[in-house]
């Protein structure tokens, strides 16, 4: 299993809305692809302007097989649903043994 780890920065007062829109747009879009195993949302009370997403993939090849144009289309859809500033400020990849 491979973990895609993303740290998102968003205004604290918009954090809950961001999580809700992500669950509506991104999670179903990723779930359509082979290898998607699930997704977790982690929140740290010390950093109310940050959201951590833990996305579980069966293999890196399956994760990387998602076409860039598909990801761009989902990004556009998300930005229409959530038209506020947000940014991926850190990303990591982990292999689970």
Predicted features and spans:
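Short acidic/polar alpha-helix capping motifs at helix-coil junctions
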Residues: 2-6, 15-16, 93
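Short alpha-helical linear motifs
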Residues: 42-46, 77, 89-93
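Short, low-order "capping/linker" segments at domain edges
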Residues: 95-97
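An amphipathic, aromatic/His-enriched active-site/gating alpha helix that lines ligand/cofactor pockets
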Residues: 24-37, 56-90
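Short, well-ordered beta-strand segments in beta-rich or mixed alpha/beta enzyme
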Residues: 2-9, 40-68
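Short, surface-exposed ligand-recognition loops at beta-strand->loop->(often short) alpha-helix junctions
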Residues: 9-22
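Short, flexible segments with low predicted structural confidence
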Residues: 1-2, 18, 34-35
